Every structure is written in C-alpha cells, then in structure tokens.
Amino acid sequence: MRFIPLLLVFSLFAQDDVGAPPKSGTTGSIGTVTLNGQVYNQLSIRPEIPIGKLGVGLDIYLYFNDEGMYWDSWDFSSGGSAYKTIIDKIYYLRWGQPGDNLYFMAGALPSVTLGQGILVNNYANIMEYPQVRQVGLNLQAKVAGFGIELIHSNFKSATPGVLGIRGSRTILPKLSLGVSFVTDLDQLAGLPDSDGDNYPDYYDYYPDDENKWDDYSSNQSLYDHHFEFYKEAHPNATLEEFLNEFTVTKSNYSPENATKDPISGLAIDATYTLSEKMTLYSQFGLLQGEIVDPEDNTKTINPGWGLVPIGARAKLGPINLLAEYRMGSRRFVFNYWDRAYDVNRVFVDASGVSTRESQLYLYGKLNGFYVQADMSVMNLFTLSSGYQYMKGEKWDKDLNKYETGETNKTFLSTISINPSLIPRVEKAEAF
C-alpha cells in the first residue's frame, strides 16, 4: 500500500500552537492510496474521544474509486478480523497535556521536540502513514523535582528511528538545565521491507512474497548440484557466473550477517525564563557515529557538533517568535531528527544504499541564524514561517574539498485556515 498526500490536508485540531500535540478535537485528511495495484481515493476522519484526562484518537477511513468501496479494512467476518479492524482504527492514546505532572501520547506522534530541539525538533512518526503505521510513545513526567521525557518512535520495531531520553531540573528559581540522549540503533532498518521477510526490498527479488527472496535460496541444493556439472566444462567458472548465465537470481544479503549502522546524539541545554511570554536558552549538541572521510575515503571520521550560544522564544500578542544564533562544526546539521527523518533516514540512489548520516560530510563549518514566527490573524488563519541563513564552508564534489564563503539557506512556511462555515471543522491546513 502506498500513500500519496495531497497539498491540502484537513487538520481539525482543537489547539492554538502550531505543531503542538492535539488536544480534544477532530483531525482528518484526504489523499490517494494504491492497494493491490489499484488506485483508491482516501477519506479519513480522526476524532478524539475525551474521557477525563484520557484521550482516544481514532482513524476512521474509507478507500473508494470509480469501481466502488474497498471493504477489506472493515472486516467483521470473524472475532479475529473484527479485533484487527478495531485496533487498526486507534490512532493514538493520550493522557493529560504537555506540562502536566504526567503526560503521554502513544501511537501516532504528530510533533515531538526534545529539549530546545537541537537534536530532535518537530519529529513525526506519521510521515509515511498509512503505508507505515508506527506505534510510538512520548512520555513526560515530573518526579522528585526532576523532569523526565522519553521518546520511542516505534514499538513495532526492535530498531526504532528515534529512541531518546531527557532529564532536566530547575537549579535556580528561573533557570533549568537539561541533558538529552538520542539514538537510532540502525539507520539501515529504515529500508522498506514490503513482505516482512527481513530482506529489504532493495535486496529482495520477490518483495511481495514473504517466503521467497531469490531463486537460488528456494532450491539451493538443486542449483549447487547443477553447478558441479557445469564446472566440468567450465572449471574456472564461479557460482555467480553460472547463475547469471541461466538467469537465476541470488541475493547477497543475509539478515543474520547484516551490519548495523547506528548514530547517536548528546545535548545539553540551559533555559532561563524571563517572564511568562519570553524565554532565553542556550544549547549544545554532539553527534556520534562513523562516516567516510571525504578527503581520504580509506578512513572514517565522527560527525560534528553544533552550538546555540543564545536563543530566545517570545510571545507578542498573536505572534510566537523564535530566534537562534547557530554555530556548527563540519559534519553537523541542526535538528538532525526532524519531521522528515523517517523519510530520509536511509535511501537508495545511484551509488546504492545511503543514510542521512553519510551525507553529513556535505556540511562544513557554518555560522548564522535561524528565525521562526507563528502568527494568528483574527482567529481566521495561522501562518508559520522559518528561515535559516548560515555562512561558511560547503563541500565541493567537483574540487573534492571544502570551499569557504558558501551559504546554506532554508525556508519553510505553512498556513492553517479556520473554515468556520464547515460544521465540526476547526482548522484546515495547506502546505
């Protein structure tokens, strides 16, 4: 099943802050999916049912095309099928709100930030939903004067893309310190595996058959026997040459011997609350992993570090402002675990399989600023825009070295519109 989001996404969150976890309300989306080779329209309504501090988020969806409805996702023919159908419609479970003594959201995580966000900022485990349905957890608790936060992006995987923990404590009346640790135990685990046979599609000649991944393994003894006869006429032939001549596929991937490619990050931050509407902070982040040295590909090197010596958050009427001065060493990118992390965690290109970490060499020493503004206008729409301008080094693939005087600019903007004429709809977002 493949999900292709449209530019228009209805988000009916009963909330004020852009990107904040949803409070009681209704969300929804429209789009298209491909099921068994057929394209269907998708209509999804996501209400939240509040029960005291508990919120149960549901995902009630329909697939249809010009030939009719797709009912396989609404199967009540047996007890087991009915149970699977009902469980499949639970989008998340929520207890309390961020800032409470105990808060958690389990299931879909639409937006999670750890600390001030130098490592994990606005992460979402729903970017490939419903093609990939992850069951994550964001837990926040206050215990004996300490703040504790936990992020787990997917309990359905032994190697989730985001596994993070943070501890914080107020050391002075308005000053708090925090320490965060984040890891991706194996970036390569993000490769798609459509049939769940532990052979990623990239290495699987039969990606939709859970019992077969190549021709050779399905009847290895037979092919080995024929190869012995083949060698009598071709004594210097290899097994691969024999299989290629007779177009017999053989995957060189082995789940038992597959190497893992982890990456981790450590962050420290200090936050000073000037008032209810303004906060100052400083944060430092360090990535730990192993990438090929672009200047000598026989060596491996560690990723780098980033520093925000001063940052500020402020609320001015309907406007929420954020500003940071950023400094980064080579091989560091701010907000490494961002909203799109699950999408670019690992990818396949002309050179083969590459990870997000492997591309860090493209970033040289950079200094600059980042600003963001969220503005609500007469409760009609909310505009959120972020801009980063960094200057310094950038890797030049043609010259095979870092060039100075280069810039790195990024811009992201979203708009949320309140369609008051639509019953029960509180917000619609366009990206």
Stretches with model-predicted labels:
Residues 1-4, 274:
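Positively charged n-region of N-terminal signal peptides that target proteins for export
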Residues 3-13:
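Sec-dependent N-terminal signal peptides
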Residues 15-46, 346:
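Short glycine/proline- and aromatic-enriched beta-strand/turn motifs that initiate or cap beta-hairpins
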Residues 19-23, 38, 68-70, 101-103, ...:
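Signature for the C-terminal beta-barrel architecture of outer-membrane proteins
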Residues 47-56, 97-101:
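Short, solvent-exposed loop/edge-beta patches enriched in aromatic
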Residues 56-92, 119, 292-293, 299-300:
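Surface-exposed loop and membrane-interface regions of Gram-negative outer-membrane beta-barrel proteins
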Residues 63, 109-110:
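Acidic, small-polar-rich N-terminal luminal/periplasmic segments of exported/outer-membrane proteins
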Residues 87-103:
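Gram-negative (and chloroplast) outer-membrane scaffold detector with strong preference
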